[in-house]
Amino acid sequence: MPVLPELSLNERRLVELIFKNRGVARIELAQMSGMTGATVTRLVASLLDLGLITEEADRSGAQGQPRRLLQLQARRFFAAGVTFSVTRMEVVIIDLSGSIVATRSVEVHTASPMEVVEAAQAAVDDMLAALSIQKNDLVGIGVSVPGNFGTASNLLKAHPFFPAFEDGQAIEAFREAFDVPCHVENDGTAAALGEYVFAGDNVLDDPLFFIHIGHGVGGGAVIDGRPYGGAHGNACLPGVLYPYDQPRPSGQDLLATLHAAGFHLRDFEEMDAMPQAARSTVIEWITRAGAQLRQAVRVATAFFDPARIVVGGRLPGDLNKRLVETILSEPIEGPSRGLPTAPVSVSRLGIRAGAVGAGCVPFFRAFFTGAVANGGSAYLNGRRPFPRTPAQ
């Protein structure tokens, strides 16, 4: 298991503020957190000892004594993210800044859960060795899957294209195979979390709603600093607006549309090399899909009143950008009298949203206050009963 200890609630508050502000002085941390200066000083000292953060002089300001800014030590801890398309599995290692430091694309030819897990495990081990990263510096592994959860946490109803994940077998296999915490999340929620943590340059982007265009039309939301999954992890599914027996604004629908026009692409990865002759088909699809997604924007605004709605997923970045342009090309009726729809933007993570989002899940569980379910934690006062090992 990693050397990272369980952080107190107050330590998580500070780390989360540093995550979101990317360079902040101690006095600002005290103001934003509501803690006393003495408490901030004590907690910052322990986080510095752990090697999780650094403090450096800011020499970009006026003359005189420079401010000292706290930032994450990006390469202190790492996480792995695993995400899937029909034919391939993408496995990445990300650092605390959300940067992908290594990636492997692995072909998937099997419906066997154990073979999928073994391939992911081999890819993670290979990347850690290539980067000389110790396993105890790996916070955990996040697995982003296209599917819905049943009433039991290990029961996953995967998209029909992903039989290896049916009935929770792969979930249990992932959790049993790795000697670090393994977290499984649906792809929409993982993408929303990655966008919130790593791409939100505005700390006021909460609530955030993510429309995830993958094989289906999924979604995710971050509300009050934590992913909102509902009772069983299946909240935020805008695809319910689009019947399966009719044209839908989904990635699979785009592949089917291209196939009907004579362009036989197996998966999203092949869209970057589409022939020029397919351009008119894609433009027609974007025009129709963008118009359909206006309804999702309106409904998401009505249900969640988000500060921002993000559109992203598995499509190439330029297609997502054109989808957003199409959505915004006509006025969208607000959800009620006098209420406008929420601002809409394209994902800043682009096609990396799935992999970075998956890797973000372990970081969120380890460092963010939203992952602490018990507000009555014994760690609330910022102290813990057991000593820990400082960074070497």
Swiss-Prot record:
What terms describe the molecular function in GO for this protein? DNA-binding transcription factor activity
Q: Name any one Pfam family assigned in the record.
A: HTH_24
Is Transferase one of the keywords UniProt gives this record? no
Would the keyword Ligase turn up in this protein's UniProt record? no
Tell me the keywords, alphabetical order: Plasmid
**UniProt xrefs under InterPro entries:** ATPase_NBD (IPR043129), ROK (IPR000600), Tscrpt_reg_HTH_Crp-type_CS (IPR018335), WH-like_DNA-bd_sf (IPR036388), WH_DNA-bd_sf (IPR036390)
Q: Mark the transmembrane ranges.
A: none
Q: Which Gene3D superfamilies match?
A: 3.30.420.40, Winged helix-like DNA-binding domain superfamily/Winged helix DNA-binding domain (1.10.10.10)
Q: What's this protein's family per the entry?
A: Belongs to the ROK (NagC/XylR) family.
By what name is this protein known? Uncharacterized protein y4fQ
